[in-house]
């Protein structure tokens, strides 16, 4: 079984970078309610839409979700 989206997202954390993906990762790290164990797209979308004012747009999440799926597929074998 692969890692959760949250664990994938944490690979983008960096205290010095300020791009949108890094900011999302840093803010999710500080968000104690973030669904850390889920791998479900819909659960994550619902959470982010209603509880993540730090995310300026869902396109950032969508890009990272696609990267997450590719990474999971690559690491499956």
Swiss-Prot record:
Family matches, as InterPro entries: UPF0346 (IPR010673), YozE_SAM-like (IPR023089), YozE_SAM-like_sf (IPR036806)
S-S bridge residues: none
Gene3D superfamilies attached to this UniProt entry: YozE SAM-like (1.10.150.260)
Family, per entry: Belongs to the UPF0346 family.
Record-given protein name: UPF0346 protein lin1971
Source species of the chain: Listeria innocua serovar 6a (strain ATCC BAA-680 / CLIP 11262)
